[in-house]
Structures are given as structure tokens and as C-alpha cells.
Regions:
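Beta-lactam-recognizing serine transpeptidase/beta-lactamase-like catalytic domain environment
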Residues: 129-131, 149-181, 196-391, 402
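Conserved, well-ordered alpha-helix/loop/beta-strand core segments that scaffold catalytic motifs
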Residues: 119-151
């Protein structure tokens, strides 16, 4: 089916060429030049893993075809419509397009394009039946309650990083499983930005930052949810998820510090990092999770490292951050629940550390996230909740954020897990 779909798509492109050039709507030379401009644009952007031009890259390269150059064949076929005088010019265009696309084809055959990237499937070989039952019950309830497209809950052991529960639910069959899904972590990345900055000596919980918005970097505008915020400490910025503050934190720490530490926490800082954009812009995007792709497993394991006092799960159990930094992150994430955007995750009598996240996909499609662990001082469970395109109405408002949708689900899962463990 996939192959026939691709063939039909190719025929559709060729039929457009026939209508435009064959019926003399545009000269073959001019049309060929337009196609060459597409090739040139792809050559400038394709090697940067730019998500915005993924479809154009696919059209130009079509790497399933053995010669990898469908667009070049389209330009070549235009010579059939052109008079002898312009035929040589079109052949020149073909050669130019070939020269531009050749290195791109080689690069894509090695690295692959974003649209063809595949996540490693979630490891579910360590599931705990009791935790699995809790996760399945809670995600089924949440998807129904929030009229969501889909949702997923994962629970991990903070001592090993192993996933001990993984449950997903959707209102429609045939949706891509969260076991393979790649997505943006949104504001759930912010504790790791803070950890990198504190650990490097560039920041602290109490350090204050200018948080005025809008904030402009290289033509891109960044704003805060609350546009009235003027300044805040790092702890306040984490609690209230102040975008501009975290951007400034990342800029002070620097590209090398942030990328290195995020990589050590298990984040991919290469695939969505765009070489054609400035380091300042890329760093700002990273501070908000916009160019850091994650999976359910990679994100929950990063939070498990925080719960494990900053120690990784490799053979040496190496420390990614210092004990002092770990204490600061725990304190800030606990404050984010008691006094910040995660208030609906509060569990009476139990200390909770966590961070909300709200990701906007395709302009009006939302992911509501909450990641955290309980209890803070001696964590027993790490929990990640993601709700896709969920909502509910309250006092005439439609609520879609991680703090409003995912945080209450986290609370229910954590309460049930702790109760089950104490029986």
C-alpha cells in the first residue's frame, strides 16, 4: 500500500507538470528554474533537521527511489516540451540540481530524515503487575474524563530507572503507540536547564533574572504565560514556569554547558538542533524543550536520575550533578508543586517533586504533561503523565495545560502506588 501511495503521489506531481507546461501555462525553462529553486532551498535547510521543511525534503529526495532524485527527473522531462534553444539551458538546470542534491542524498542515506526517524520501543520487560493495573485504570479514566485523543502513563523505579508500568489509551484505534512516539518535552525540560546552570556555578535558586516579555532572539519571539512578570529568582521561574527567565538562565550558562549536561541526562541535543540558526536561538529553544526530541522512556529516565540524587544508572552509578545541585533541584520541584503550576499534584502528608509542561503541536493541538517523583527525600516512584488533545471546562474557560490536566492524574497514580506498596 505504501509503495502504491508513493507511486500515485509521483504521478500527481508529474501530471501537474503536464498541465502547466504541456498546456503552455508557463514556459518549460521558467518552470524548470522554479523547481531548481526548490532544490536550492532544500540544500540550505535539509541538513539542519529543520522540522518545518521536512515535507519539502521528502519531495526533493524521495530516497526510497534508487536514484534518489525524483525532482531531477521532473526537470529532465521538461526538455520534451522545450524548443532546441532552451533545451540546453534546461539541461544545465538539471546538472545544477544534480550537483546540489548529490551530497544531500549521501547525508540523508547516512543520517536519515526527521520524518523517517524511529524511536527505540519502550522497554516493558520489568513491569510490576500492581503498578501496571494502577496505570491502566488511571489513563483510561483520564482519557475519557478529558475527552482526549490519547494519553499515556509510565511509572519508573528510581533505584534502577526501569519502567515498571506503561499504559496508554486512545479514543480511536489505529493511532501511533506512545511506545514509539517522539515528542517535545515542553517545560518539563526546565529542571534540567536549571541543573546544568547551577552545577556549573552559573546560577542558584535565589539568583534573580530579568523576565520581561516579549523577548526577541534572531527574529523569533518568546513570551511568558503571564506577561506581567518583570523579574524572578530561578526557584520562582521553575515554580511558575517563566519562559524568558529560563532562556536567560541557559544563555548565561552557555551552549556547551547546557548541551553537555542535557546529553548526560539522556536527552538528544543533535537531531532537532538546527545548524542554520544561531546558538543563542537554539539555546532559547532548548530551554523550552522546542528542539529536544524525547520519548516516554527517555523522559521518565531523565526524571529518575533526578530522583536518584543525580546519579545515572550506568555500571558506575556516576554522578551527573553534585549533591548540592541535586538538593536544589529537589527543593525547587517540591516548591513547583506546593506553590507553583503543579498545585493539583499535591498529596496531603506526602512530599511531591514535579514539573508541568504544555506543548502546542500544529498551532492548536496540545500535549499536557506532568513528570515527578514521590516522596521527595526518599523517592519510591517516578511518574510521567501525558494527555494528548484533552480539555475540560471550568467557569466558562477551556482548560488544556499540564497543570490542569496531567497534574491531577499524577496525583491519583502516585497516591494509588504508595497505598498499594504500603499494604
Amino acid at each position: 500500500v505504501t509503495q502504491w501511495f508513493r507511486v500515485l503521489a509521483d504521478l500527481q506531481e508529474l501530471s501537474c507538470d503536464e498541465v502547466l507546461v504541456g498546456h503552455q501555462k508557463i514556459s518549460a525553462h521558467d518552470y524548470g528554474h522554479c523547481l531548481l529553486q526548490v532544490v536550492e532551498a532544500v540544500s540550505q535547510c535539509s541538513l539542519t533537521s529543520n522540522r518545518e521543511i521536512a515535507c519539502t525534503v521528502g519531495m526533493a529526495l524521495n530516497k526510497e527511489n534508487e536514484d534518489c532524485k525524483f525532482i531531477i527527473r521532473r526537470i529532465s522531462m521538461l526538455t520534451a516540451y522545450s524548443p532546441n534553444a532552451s533545451r540546453s539551458l534546461l539541461l544545465g538546470i538539471v546538472f545544477a540540481g544534480f550537483s546540489i542534491l548529490s551530497p544531500i542524498c549521501v547525508a540523508y542515506s547516512t543520517a536519515g530524515s526527521l520524518t523517517n526517524s524511529r524511536a527505540k520501543e519502550v522497554d516493558i520487560s520489568h513491569l510490576d503487575p500492581r503498578m501496571q493495573q494502577i496505570a491502566e485504570k488511571q489513563i483510561t479514566t483520564a482519557v475519557k474524563q478529558y475527552h482526549a485523543k490519547s494519553g499515556v502513563i509510565a511509572i519508573a523505579d528510581p533505584q534502577t530507572g526501569n519502567i515498571i508500568a506503561f499504559a496508554e489509551s486512545s479514543k480511536n484505534k489505529g493511532l501511533e503507540s506512545w511506545k514509539l512516539r517522539i515528542f517535545s518535552p515542553g517545560s518539563t525540560i526546565k529542571p534540567f536547564i536549571a541543573a546544568a546552570a547551577i552545577n556549573s556555578g552559573n546560577s542558584s535558586e535565589t539568583k534573580n533574572y530579568d523576565c520581561h516579555s516579549p523577548y526577541y532572539i534572531a527574529g523569533k519571539t518568546f513570551t511568558n504565560y503571564n506577561s506581567n512578570v518583570e523579574s524572578a529568582s530561578l526557584a520562582e521561574a521553575i515554580a511558575k514556569s517563566i519562559n524568558v527567565c529560563l532562556i536567560r538562565v541557559s544563555q548565561e550558562a552557555g551552549v556547551s554547558v547546557i548541551r553537555k549536561k542535557l546529553t548526560e541526562f539522556g536527552f538528544d541535543t543533535s537531531t532537532w538542533w538546527q545548524a542554520d540558526r544561531s546558538d543563542g536561538l537554539q539555546l532559547a529553544m532548548a530551554a523550552l524543550g522546542e528542539n529536544i526530541p524525547v520519548t516516554i522512556e527517555s523522559l521518565i529516565k531523565s526524571y529518575a536520575i533526578l530522583a536518584n540524587k543525580g546519579h545515572s544508572f550506568d555500571k558506575g552509578n556516576s554522578a551527573i550533578i553534585s549533591e548540592t545541585t541535586s538538593y536544589s533541584i529537589n527543593h525547587m520541584l517540591e516548591n513547583a508543586v506546593t506553590n507553583g503550576t503543579g498545585k493539583l499534584a499535591v498529596i496531603p502528608g506526602v512530599s511531591v517533586a514535579g514539573k508541568t509542561g504544555t506543548v502546542i503541536e500544529n498551532n492548536d493541538k496540545y500535549l499536557a504533561l506532568f513528570a515527578g517523583y514521590v516522596p521527595v527525600d526518599n523517592p519510591r516512584y517516578v511518574v510521567l503523565v501525558v494527555i494528548e488533545e484533552g480539555y475540560f471546562s471550568k467557569n466558562g474557560k477551556t482548560l488544556v495545560s499540564g497543570g490542569e490536566l496531567a497534574a491531577p492524574v499524577f496525583r491519583n497514580v502516585a497516591m494509588d502506588a504508595l497505598s498499594s506498596a504500603n499494604r
